[in-house]
Amino acid sequence: SYTWEFPEGQSLESITVSISMKEQGGYYDQYLIHQLTRTDERADYASDAVFANFRNVAVGDLGENAFFRSSSPVNNELGRASYADDLAEAGGIQAVMNLADSNELIEGYIAAEGFDSPYYQSLYEAGKVKALNLGVDFTAADFKSGLAEGLRFFAENEGPYLVHCTEGKDRAGFV
């Protein structure tokens, strides 16, 4: 908060404050970003990939279509799992780092009525999913050690690789 101090004899009513920007519309893009809302309706998104937050991560020496991030292909809490699962299969994903869930949670999702992520299930049953059950504190010792465990898992397995959390933006975005 800010406390306004007025010269003697002046009050808020007697002072005019003017705020201007360096350029017209200079903040408009940021304004629009802050107006974004998330829905759980597929029709509100341009594509299955946008809905599932399924993205190729091609930076540095990583080649195209070698490493992906997404929302959860196994936890259908947001209604995106089957979309992420289909995209993982189409991308030829061979190893998965699940930052959000434990093995017990994954097995619960698979056993749930209406589960519709057969590709993820096949990877899990083949030992190609590393369940890390990490929180969102990237500075925590357990996050650091869990991430190291996940990266070793990737090094021991062939790609393409997928890293995901629940929504695919915080933990997966950080990784």
Label each region the model flagged.
Residues S20-L162, F174-V175:
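Cys-dependent protein tyrosine phosphatase-like superfamily
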Residues S1-G25:
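Charge-biased, low-complexity intrinsically disordered regions
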